[in-house]
Amino acid sequence: MNRFSVLMCLVILSIFHGVPTAEGDVTVKFSLLGSNHKSYSKFITSMRNALPNAGDIYNIPLLVPSISGSRRYILMQLSNYEGNTITMAVDVTNVYIMGYLVNGTSYFFNETDAQLASKFVFQGTKSITLPYSGNYQKLQSVARKERDSIPLGFMALDSAISTLYYYDSRSAPIAFLVLIQTTAEAARYKYIEKQIIDRISVSKVPDLAAISLENEWSLLSKQIQIAKSNNGQFQTPVKIINDKGILTEVTNVSSLVVTKNIMLLLNKLNIASFEDHVISTTMPQA
């Protein structure tokens, strides 16, 4: 292999598998310009691979329970069709978005974990605390819309990136809801990744199965970990809505949700704090 070939391989790896920065962070990138289902899937795969894990349970990576300093975060660079770029900071212990950077200004959610993240990422920038936290309950409340009424897809992602790039405060909560599902939730579930791929050309609202999976990630993660020492059986069934819109119970690891769908497990040591995070309110302003 000649030097040019080696260089090209390194460039490709840097795009799809993450590049360590001077701060020790890892950056994964996705641009809508020239994108298709293959490039999006490669991006989601690279995002999953960038998350450190504590081993596999039933062939599913188990996220680490904790990690210190800047290593707790990866950076996710997103560009829209016009080439506008934003960079999101993602907590590797739960795939939770902490905030984002555009040009020289960083925006962080109004919550304890995001304020901690601001001490390690986007250093040397003008830092702004958003007037809300990053959990679904709060974002939907501020947006005055539920997730099942907000379209997803490449056009929706393009609009979301533009909204945050120019920071339209009225539309920002909806933009975050689109970004979270298009990136973090797609990394957690193959089904949600496919939902986005099915919406490349035309934006549509997510189906109830996708919303159900999003809501039950911590419970599914917990029961899969319990099943490891319980002959593959869940201690408590997890109720989800399937792709036919029917409420069903997942009771063991032979379920397709476990074998073909869930791609990351939230560590059981973090489940209580994650659930508190999901329903938390904003921090009081000083």
UniProtKB/Swiss-Prot annotation:
Known EC number: 3.2.2.22
Active site: E185
Keywords annotated in UniProt: Antiviral defense, Glycoprotein, Hydrolase, Plant defense, Protein synthesis inhibitor, Signal, Toxin
GO BP of this protein: defense response to virus; negative regulation of translation
Catalytic reaction annotation: Endohydrolysis of the N-glycosidic bond at one specific adenosine on the 28S rRNA
Leader peptide range in chain numbering: 1-21
Pfam families documented for this protein: RIP
GO molecular function: rRNA N-glycosylase activity; toxin activity
Catalytic EC class: hydrolase
Matching InterPro entries: Ribosome-inact_prot_sf, Ribosome_inactivat_1/2, Ribosome_inactivat_prot, Ribosome_inactivat_prot_CS, Ribosome_inactivat_prot_sub1, Ribosome_inactivat_prot_sub2
Entry-listed glycosylation sites: N103, N110, N252
PANTHER family according to UniProt: PTHR33453, RIBOSOME-INACTIVATING PROTEIN (PTHR33453:SF34)
Family according to the record: Belongs to the ribosome-inactivating protein family. Type 1 RIP subfamily.
Name of the protein: Putative ribosome-inactivating protein
Species of origin: Cucumis ficifolius (Cucumis figarei)
